[in-house]
Amino acid sequence: MSARGVLAELLWAEKYRPRSLREIVNQEEIVKRLQVFVKEKNMPHLLFAGPPGTGKTTAAHALAHDLYGEDYRLYMLELNASDERGIDVIRTKVKEFARSKLPANVPFKIVLLDEADNMTADAQQALRRLMEMYVDVTRFILIANYPSKIIEPIQSRCAVFRFTQLKKEDVISRLKWICSNEKVVCDDRGLEAIYEVSEGDMRKAINILQAAAALGEVNVSNVYKVVGLATPAEIRALLKSALFEGDFLKARDNLRKLMVSYGLSGVDIIKQLHREIFSSEINMPEEMRVEIADYLGEIQFRLVEGADDEIQLSALLAKLVLLGKPLRQQAQAKPTKVK
Protein backbone atom coordinates (compact mmCIF):
# COMPACT_ATOMS: atom_id res chain seq x y z
CA MET A 1 0.00 0.00 0.00
CA SER A 2 1.29 3.48 -0.86
CA ALA A 3 2.11 6.07 1.81
CA ARG A 4 -1.01 8.01 0.83
CA GLY A 5 -3.07 4.82 1.03
CA VAL A 6 -1.81 4.15 4.56
CA LEU A 7 -2.57 7.77 5.47
CA ALA A 8 -6.11 7.44 4.15
CA GLU A 9 -6.66 4.43 6.40
CA LEU A 10 -5.50 6.40 9.43
CA LEU A 11 -6.93 9.88 8.78
CA TRP A 12 -10.59 10.40 7.99
CA ALA A 13 -9.75 13.72 6.33
CA GLU A 14 -7.82 11.72 3.69
CA LYS A 15 -10.17 8.74 3.63
CA TYR A 16 -13.17 10.94 2.87
CA ARG A 17 -11.46 13.51 0.66
CA PRO A 18 -13.47 13.90 -2.59
CA ARG A 19 -11.68 12.21 -5.50
CA SER A 20 -13.77 13.74 -8.29
CA LEU A 21 -15.20 17.21 -8.88
CA ARG A 22 -18.75 15.89 -8.58
CA GLU A 23 -18.07 14.87 -4.95
CA ILE A 24 -17.02 18.36 -3.78
CA VAL A 25 -19.28 20.01 -1.19
CA ASN A 26 -20.79 23.48 -1.58
CA GLN A 27 -18.64 25.14 -4.29
CA GLU A 28 -21.21 24.55 -7.06
CA GLU A 29 -20.31 27.41 -9.41
CA ILE A 30 -16.59 26.67 -9.23
CA VAL A 31 -17.19 22.97 -9.86
CA LYS A 32 -19.30 23.74 -12.94
CA ARG A 33 -16.55 25.90 -14.44
CA LEU A 34 -13.86 23.31 -13.72
CA GLN A 35 -15.96 20.57 -15.29
CA VAL A 36 -15.99 22.59 -18.52
CA PHE A 37 -12.17 22.44 -18.52
CA VAL A 38 -12.35 18.66 -18.10
CA LYS A 39 -14.81 18.35 -20.97
CA GLU A 40 -12.68 20.50 -23.29
CA LYS A 41 -9.39 18.92 -22.15
CA ASN A 42 -7.95 22.41 -21.90
CA MET A 43 -7.59 25.10 -19.24
CA PRO A 44 -5.66 28.29 -18.43
CA HIS A 45 -3.36 28.73 -15.45
CA LEU A 46 -5.51 28.75 -12.31
CA LEU A 47 -5.41 30.60 -9.00
CA PHE A 48 -7.55 29.09 -6.22
CA ALA A 49 -8.05 31.61 -3.42
CA GLY A 50 -9.98 31.43 -0.17
CA PRO A 51 -9.93 30.49 3.53
CA PRO A 52 -8.34 27.24 4.76
CA GLY A 53 -10.43 24.07 4.55
CA THR A 54 -12.77 25.25 1.79
CA GLY A 55 -11.64 22.67 -0.77
CA LYS A 56 -8.95 24.45 -2.80
CA THR A 57 -6.35 21.67 -2.77
CA THR A 58 -9.04 19.01 -3.03
CA ALA A 59 -10.49 20.75 -6.11
CA ALA A 60 -7.05 20.83 -7.75
CA HIS A 61 -6.54 17.09 -7.21
CA ALA A 62 -10.10 16.31 -8.30
CA LEU A 63 -9.60 18.35 -11.48
CA ALA A 64 -6.40 16.44 -12.29
CA HIS A 65 -8.13 13.14 -11.49
CA ASP A 66 -11.02 13.90 -13.82
CA LEU A 67 -8.60 14.95 -16.57
CA TYR A 68 -6.16 12.04 -16.37
CA GLY A 69 -7.82 9.26 -14.36
CA GLU A 70 -6.45 7.31 -11.40
CA ASP A 71 -2.81 7.80 -12.48
CA TYR A 72 -3.07 11.59 -12.55
CA ARG A 73 -0.08 11.99 -10.21
CA LEU A 74 2.21 10.85 -13.03
CA TYR A 75 1.41 14.09 -14.85
CA MET A 76 1.39 16.46 -11.89
CA LEU A 77 4.15 18.02 -9.79
CA GLU A 78 2.89 19.07 -6.36
CA LEU A 79 4.92 21.38 -4.13
CA ASN A 80 4.08 23.13 -0.88
CA ALA A 81 5.38 26.63 -1.44
CA SER A 82 5.56 27.38 2.28
CA ASP A 83 8.31 24.73 2.59
CA GLU A 84 9.88 25.17 -0.84
CA ARG A 85 9.39 28.86 -1.35
CA GLY A 86 12.69 30.07 -2.75
CA ILE A 87 13.84 30.87 -6.25
CA ASP A 88 16.11 27.78 -6.40
CA VAL A 89 13.10 25.43 -6.27
CA ILE A 90 11.45 27.31 -9.14
CA ARG A 91 14.64 27.19 -11.23
CA THR A 92 15.28 23.49 -10.59
CA LYS A 93 12.32 21.26 -9.73
CA VAL A 94 9.60 23.34 -11.36
CA LYS A 95 11.58 24.27 -14.47
CA GLU A 96 12.77 20.71 -15.09
CA PHE A 97 9.24 19.34 -14.81
CA ALA A 98 7.65 22.14 -16.85
CA ARG A 99 9.96 21.70 -19.84
CA SER A 100 10.02 17.89 -19.84
CA LYS A 101 8.47 16.10 -22.80
CA LEU A 102 4.72 15.49 -22.80
CA PRO A 103 3.58 11.84 -22.59
CA ALA A 104 1.42 10.60 -25.43
CA ASN A 105 -2.28 11.50 -25.29
CA VAL A 106 -1.73 13.98 -22.43
CA PRO A 107 -2.72 17.55 -23.40
CA PHE A 108 -0.54 19.21 -20.75
CA LYS A 109 1.14 18.60 -17.39
CA ILE A 110 0.10 20.32 -14.16
CA VAL A 111 2.28 22.06 -11.58
CA LEU A 112 0.37 22.47 -8.30
CA LEU A 113 1.84 25.06 -5.92
CA ASP A 114 0.06 24.92 -2.57
CA GLU A 115 0.33 27.94 -0.24
CA ALA A 116 1.77 29.95 -3.13
CA ASP A 117 1.20 33.16 -1.19
CA ASN A 118 4.23 32.19 0.94
CA MET A 119 6.63 32.31 -2.01
CA THR A 120 9.31 34.97 -2.01
CA ALA A 121 9.06 37.89 -4.43
CA ASP A 122 12.05 36.62 -6.44
CA ALA A 123 10.52 33.14 -6.69
CA GLN A 124 7.25 34.63 -7.93
CA GLN A 125 9.07 36.61 -10.63
CA ALA A 126 10.87 33.46 -11.77
CA LEU A 127 7.57 31.57 -11.74
CA ARG A 128 5.95 34.24 -13.91
CA ARG A 129 8.58 33.68 -16.59
CA LEU A 130 8.10 29.89 -16.50
CA MET A 131 4.34 30.32 -16.86
CA GLU A 132 4.98 32.28 -20.07
CA MET A 133 7.69 30.01 -21.50
CA TYR A 134 6.06 26.61 -21.04
CA VAL A 135 2.36 27.38 -21.41
CA ASP A 136 2.16 25.02 -24.42
CA VAL A 137 2.97 21.96 -22.34
CA THR A 138 2.36 22.90 -18.70
CA ARG A 139 -0.44 24.52 -16.71
CA PHE A 140 0.05 25.95 -13.23
CA ILE A 141 -2.47 25.78 -10.39
CA LEU A 142 -1.64 28.16 -7.55
CA ILE A 143 -3.39 27.87 -4.19
CA ALA A 144 -3.44 30.80 -1.78
CA ASN A 145 -5.22 31.81 1.41
CA TYR A 146 -4.22 35.44 0.77
CA PRO A 147 -4.25 36.16 -2.99
CA SER A 148 -3.14 39.76 -2.38
CA LYS A 149 0.33 38.31 -1.67
CA ILE A 150 0.54 36.96 -5.23
CA ILE A 151 2.15 39.50 -7.57
CA GLU A 152 -0.17 41.11 -10.11
CA PRO A 153 1.65 39.74 -13.22
CA ILE A 154 0.92 36.19 -12.01
CA GLN A 155 -2.69 36.98 -11.09
CA SER A 156 -3.29 38.46 -14.55
CA ARG A 157 -2.09 35.20 -16.17
CA CYS A 158 -4.52 33.07 -14.15
CA ALA A 159 -8.23 32.42 -14.07
CA VAL A 160 -9.06 33.25 -10.45
CA PHE A 161 -11.47 31.05 -8.48
CA ARG A 162 -12.56 32.38 -5.08
CA PHE A 163 -13.63 29.63 -2.70
CA THR A 164 -16.20 30.69 -0.11
CA GLN A 165 -16.60 29.57 3.50
CA LEU A 166 -18.57 26.34 3.68
CA LYS A 167 -22.16 26.56 4.90
CA LYS A 168 -22.95 25.18 8.33
CA GLU A 169 -25.53 22.73 7.00
CA ASP A 170 -23.07 21.38 4.40
CA VAL A 171 -20.34 20.76 6.97
CA ILE A 172 -22.69 19.11 9.45
CA SER A 173 -24.26 16.98 6.71
CA ARG A 174 -20.81 15.72 5.71
CA LEU A 175 -19.90 14.98 9.34
CA LYS A 176 -23.14 13.02 9.82
CA TRP A 177 -22.38 10.99 6.70
CA ILE A 178 -18.91 10.14 8.01
CA CYS A 179 -20.36 9.18 11.42
CA SER A 180 -22.81 6.86 9.68
CA ASN A 181 -20.02 5.22 7.65
CA GLU A 182 -17.76 4.82 10.69
CA LYS A 183 -20.61 3.67 13.01
CA VAL A 184 -19.91 6.60 15.36
CA VAL A 185 -22.48 7.79 17.91
CA CYS A 186 -22.99 11.55 17.62
CA ASP A 187 -25.53 14.19 18.59
CA ASP A 188 -26.51 17.40 16.82
CA ARG A 189 -25.07 19.68 19.51
CA GLY A 190 -21.74 17.91 19.29
CA LEU A 191 -21.61 18.35 15.51
CA GLU A 192 -22.59 22.02 15.86
CA ALA A 193 -19.76 22.44 18.38
CA ILE A 194 -17.34 20.98 15.82
CA TYR A 195 -18.53 23.48 13.22
CA GLU A 196 -18.07 26.38 15.66
CA VAL A 197 -14.52 25.50 16.70
CA SER A 198 -13.45 24.56 13.16
CA GLU A 199 -14.78 27.90 11.84
CA GLY A 200 -16.04 26.30 8.64
CA ASP A 201 -12.75 24.52 7.85
CA MET A 202 -13.88 21.11 6.58
CA ARG A 203 -10.47 19.44 7.00
CA LYS A 204 -10.20 20.69 10.59
CA ALA A 205 -13.81 19.65 11.30
CA ILE A 206 -13.18 16.07 10.14
CA ASN A 207 -9.98 15.83 12.20
CA ILE A 208 -11.85 17.03 15.30
CA LEU A 209 -14.64 14.54 14.58
CA GLN A 210 -12.16 11.66 14.45
CA ALA A 211 -10.45 12.75 17.66
CA ALA A 212 -13.78 13.13 19.51
CA ALA A 213 -15.00 9.77 18.21
CA ALA A 214 -11.93 8.14 19.77
CA LEU A 215 -13.37 9.12 23.18
CA GLY A 216 -16.47 7.03 22.49
CA GLU A 217 -19.12 9.55 21.48
CA VAL A 218 -19.21 12.85 19.60
CA ASN A 219 -20.84 15.26 22.05
CA VAL A 220 -20.14 18.81 23.21
CA SER A 221 -18.02 17.73 26.16
CA ASN A 222 -15.74 15.45 24.11
CA VAL A 223 -15.40 17.99 21.29
CA TYR A 224 -14.08 20.65 23.64
CA LYS A 225 -11.83 18.13 25.38
CA VAL A 226 -10.03 17.21 22.17
CA VAL A 227 -9.59 20.80 20.94
CA GLY A 228 -8.36 22.01 24.34
CA LEU A 229 -10.83 24.89 24.62
CA ALA A 230 -13.19 25.95 27.39
CA THR A 231 -16.83 25.08 26.82
CA PRO A 232 -19.23 27.88 25.87
CA ALA A 233 -20.95 27.44 29.26
CA GLU A 234 -17.64 28.12 31.06
CA ILE A 235 -16.97 31.22 28.97
CA ARG A 236 -20.51 32.49 29.60
CA ALA A 237 -20.02 31.94 33.34
CA LEU A 238 -16.88 34.09 33.14
CA LEU A 239 -18.80 36.83 31.33
CA LYS A 240 -21.72 36.71 33.76
CA SER A 241 -19.54 36.94 36.87
CA ALA A 242 -18.01 40.15 35.52
CA LEU A 243 -20.93 41.76 33.67
CA PHE A 244 -24.00 40.73 35.63
CA GLU A 245 -22.58 40.05 39.10
CA GLY A 246 -19.87 42.71 39.10
CA ASP A 247 -17.57 40.34 40.99
CA PHE A 248 -14.11 41.09 39.64
CA LEU A 249 -12.25 38.70 41.96
CA LYS A 250 -14.58 35.80 41.13
CA ALA A 251 -14.23 36.51 37.42
CA ARG A 252 -10.43 36.63 37.69
CA ASP A 253 -10.39 33.33 39.59
CA ASN A 254 -12.58 31.75 36.90
CA LEU A 255 -10.22 33.10 34.25
CA ARG A 256 -7.15 31.64 35.95
CA LYS A 257 -8.83 28.24 36.32
CA LEU A 258 -9.67 28.17 32.62
CA MET A 259 -6.15 29.12 31.59
CA VAL A 260 -4.60 26.47 33.86
CA SER A 261 -7.14 23.70 33.14
CA TYR A 262 -7.06 24.04 29.35
CA GLY A 263 -3.66 25.64 28.81
CA LEU A 264 -5.34 28.53 27.02
CA SER A 265 -3.46 31.56 25.78
CA GLY A 266 -4.83 35.06 26.09
CA VAL A 267 -5.70 35.11 22.39
CA ASP A 268 -7.65 31.83 22.79
CA ILE A 269 -9.72 33.40 25.58
CA ILE A 270 -10.35 36.54 23.51
CA LYS A 271 -11.60 34.50 20.55
CA GLN A 272 -13.99 32.50 22.72
CA LEU A 273 -15.26 35.62 24.50
CA HIS A 274 -15.85 37.28 21.13
CA ARG A 275 -17.97 34.34 20.01
CA GLU A 276 -20.02 34.29 23.22
CA ILE A 277 -20.85 38.00 23.45
CA PHE A 278 -22.92 37.54 20.30
CA SER A 279 -24.59 34.41 21.66
CA SER A 280 -28.34 34.49 22.27
CA GLU A 281 -27.55 33.10 25.74
CA ILE A 282 -26.14 36.49 26.77
CA ASN A 283 -28.80 39.18 27.14
CA MET A 284 -27.41 42.71 26.80
CA PRO A 285 -28.04 45.87 24.74
CA GLU A 286 -26.62 45.86 21.21
CA GLU A 287 -24.53 48.95 21.96
CA MET A 288 -22.81 47.08 24.79
CA ARG A 289 -21.98 44.12 22.52
CA VAL A 290 -20.39 46.54 20.06
CA GLU A 291 -18.35 48.27 22.77
CA ILE A 292 -17.13 44.95 24.19
CA ALA A 293 -16.23 43.67 20.70
CA ASP A 294 -14.22 46.83 20.08
CA TYR A 295 -12.36 46.44 23.37
CA LEU A 296 -11.68 42.75 22.70
CA GLY A 297 -10.01 43.78 19.44
CA GLU A 298 -7.83 46.26 21.31
CA ILE A 299 -6.80 43.64 23.89
CA GLN A 300 -6.02 41.09 21.17
CA PHE A 301 -3.77 43.61 19.42
CA ARG A 302 -1.86 44.21 22.66
CA LEU A 303 -1.44 40.46 23.20
CA VAL A 304 -0.17 39.90 19.67
CA GLU A 305 2.33 42.70 20.24
CA GLY A 306 3.70 40.83 23.27
CA ALA A 307 1.78 42.21 26.26
CA ASP A 308 1.32 40.03 29.36
CA ASP A 309 -1.73 37.73 29.09
CA GLU A 310 -2.91 37.94 32.69
CA ILE A 311 -2.53 41.70 33.00
CA GLN A 312 -4.41 42.37 29.77
CA LEU A 313 -7.21 39.91 30.54
CA SER A 314 -7.55 41.34 34.06
CA ALA A 315 -7.91 44.78 32.48
CA LEU A 316 -10.60 43.32 30.23
CA LEU A 317 -12.51 41.88 33.19
CA ALA A 318 -12.29 45.24 34.99
CA LYS A 319 -13.75 46.90 31.90
CA LEU A 320 -16.59 44.35 31.81
CA VAL A 321 -17.37 44.99 35.49
CA LEU A 322 -17.66 48.72 34.79
CA LEU A 323 -19.69 48.25 31.61
CA GLY A 324 -22.11 45.95 33.40
CA LYS A 325 -22.97 48.46 36.14
CA PRO A 326 -26.13 49.80 34.37
CA LEU A 327 -27.34 46.23 33.83
CA ARG A 328 -26.93 45.41 37.52
CA GLN A 329 -28.65 48.62 38.58
CA GLN A 330 -31.53 47.89 36.25
CA ALA A 331 -31.90 44.36 37.65
CA GLN A 332 -31.91 45.65 41.23
CA ALA A 333 -34.40 48.44 40.62
CA LYS A 334 -37.84 47.62 41.99
CA PRO A 335 -40.87 48.75 39.98
CA THR A 336 -42.86 51.52 41.66
CA LYS A 337 -46.49 50.86 42.40
CA VAL A 338 -49.02 53.01 40.56
CA LYS A 339 -51.65 54.45 42.92
Language model features: what each stretch is:
Residues 91, 151-196, 205-208:
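Conserved AAA+ ATPase core "coupling" helix
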Residues 27, 200-201:
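Short loop-to-helix capping motifs
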Residues 238-339:
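Helix-rich C-terminal "collar"/helical-bundle subdomain used as an assembly and partner-interaction module
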Residues 1-160, 170, 296, 300, ...:
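P-loop/Walker A NTP-binding region and its immediately flanking N-terminal helices
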Residues 111, 191-197, 203-217, 224-225, ...:
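C-terminal helical "lid" of AAA+/P-loop NTPase domains
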Residues 234:
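Conserved ATP-binding/catalytic motifs of P-loop helicase motor domains
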